């Protein structure tokens, strides 16, 4: 919305004082800190410890944003924390699905466990939530910024959201599919193999990675069952993978791949949700 020219504006300090009384403001701050730490995560490629710290903080802040949304649902009686109904709620509430997955990964990250790619889709959502809140609730009241610049920023943000929201939502699903395939086809089976081989001397890193991987696969199944568009995109990626294997590898490799893929899918459908 364009910033009005003649309507008197409350001082920015007054606006902030009113905003900090609202849960949505902390939701906004959580999205900002998520984006900031996600950027720091990618800038810290030379330090594994710094990356781990940024990963933990990103998971924490984005979990807080989902917790705030769930709290709002709870206050308005849209969500009841009844353990007998939790399974049904988990199947239909995407906010609950994301919170559960992210919070479990946050807990496991305290033991140096990272699931690469798990942050991409939540961060995409954070970018759009951050921009929309900033445009509607803070930009009109910012001091020392000319009105024409505020209107320009408002217009640019509005156009970006309108033109790219659908595209980036689809990209978020693509990232979840890529992460789900990588974790389900390789990470979980590999760590399960290590678990069997090193039963007497298995490290917590293997167990933790296994738990984190299963958490993401469980989350992915919930998203897969709930979203028709994700099912369609998933089928396209599996078909591309099948075509690549049959086109570039010997026939026996294609048979092995199909057998392995069918085995993984059988296990996938047995995962309880």
UniProtKB/Swiss-Prot annotation:
Topological relation to the membrane, as annotated: Multi-pass membrane protein
UniProt keyword annotation of Ion transport present: no
Subcellular locations according to the entry: Endoplasmic reticulum membrane; Nucleus, Nuclear pore complex
Chain ranges on the Lumenal side, renumbered to this chain: 46-56, 120-126, 198-199
Any Pfam family: TMEM33_Pom33
Keyword Protease: no
GO biological process, one term: membrane organization
Recorded GO CC terms: endoplasmic reticulum; endoplasmic reticulum membrane; nuclear envelope; nuclear pore
Residues in compartment: Cytoplasmic: 1-24, 75-98, 148-176, 221-273
Principal location class: endoplasmic reticulum
Record key words, sorted: Endoplasmic reticulum, Membrane, mRNA transport, Nuclear pore complex, Nucleus, Protein transport, Translocation, Transmembrane, Transmembrane helix, Transport
Similarity comment text for this entry: Belongs to the PER33/POM33 family.
Further facts: Present with 2240 molecules/cell in log phase SD medium.
UniProt protein name: Pore and endoplasmic reticulum protein of 33 kDa
Gene name per UniProt: PER33
């Amino acid at each position: 919305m364009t910033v009005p020219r003649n309507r008197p504006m409350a001082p920015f300090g007054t606006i902030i004082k009113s905003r900090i009384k609202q849960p949505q403001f902390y939701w906004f701050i959580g999205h900002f800190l998520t984006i900031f730490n996600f950027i720091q995560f990618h800038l810290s490629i030379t330090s594994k410890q710094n990356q781990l710290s940024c990963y933990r903080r990103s998971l924490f802040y984005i979990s807080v944003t989902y917790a705030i949304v769930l709290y709002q649902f709870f206050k308005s009686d849209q969500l009841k924390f009844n353990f007998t109904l939790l399974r049904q709620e988990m199947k239909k509430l995407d906010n609950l699905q994301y919170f559960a997955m992210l919070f479990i990964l946050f807990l496991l990250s305290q033991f140096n466990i990272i699931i690469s790619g798990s942050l991409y889709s939540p961060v995409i959502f954070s970018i759009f939530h951050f921009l929309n809140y900033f445009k509607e609730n803070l930009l009109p009241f910012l001091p020392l910024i000319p009105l024409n610049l505020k209107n320009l920023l408002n217009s640019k943000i509005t156009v970006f959201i309108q033109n790219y929201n659908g595209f980036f939502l689809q990209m978020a699903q693509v990232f979840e599919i890529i992460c789900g395939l990588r974790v389900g086809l390789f990470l979980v089976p590999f760590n399960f193999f290590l678990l069997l081989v090193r039963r007497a001397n298995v490290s917590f890193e293997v167990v933790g990675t296994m738990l984190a991987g299963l958490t993401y696969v469980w989350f992915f199944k919930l998203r897969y069952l709930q979203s028709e568009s994700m099912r369609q995109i998933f089928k396209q990626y599996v078909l591309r993978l099948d075509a690549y294997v049959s086109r570039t590898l010997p026939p026996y490799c294609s048979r092995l791949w199909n057998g392995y893929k069918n085995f993984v899918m059988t296990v996938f459908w047995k995962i309880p949700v």
